[in-house]
């Protein structure tokens, strides 16, 4: 494997795993709360986008990036509505 491909595949593997964990958890949570399928799917996709960058976000915040998988599951469990409301409250936009 070339020297260019190996780091790229490592990044994609890690981000893909985190995104998949957030997606699955969000989809399970939404279906458990009996939300309709398309709303559940959209919520899960948005959580997957956040979960995919959990590793970099933890590094940016100065935290240990080894917990990015746990952070991705937490993102999926909380959902984008709750995370968005929390961010609005923290920034004073609510």
From Swiss-Prot:
A Pfam family per the record: Phage_holin_3_1
Membrane spanning residue stretches: none
GO BP annotations, alphabetical order: killing of cells of another organism
Keyword annotations: Cytolysis, Host cell lysis by virus, Viral release from host cell
Disulfide bond residue pairs: none
InterPro entries assigned to the protein according to its UniProt record, in alphabetical order: Phage_lambda_GpS_holin
Family per similarity comment: Belongs to the lambda phage S protein family.
NCBIfam families membership: holin_lambda
The protein's role, per its UniProt record: Essential for lysis of the bacterial cell wall by disrupting the cell membrane, thereby giving hydrolytic enzymes access to the cell wall.
Protein known as: Putative lysis protein S
Protein's organism: Acyrthosiphon pisum secondary endosymbiont phage 1 (Bacteriophage APSE-1)
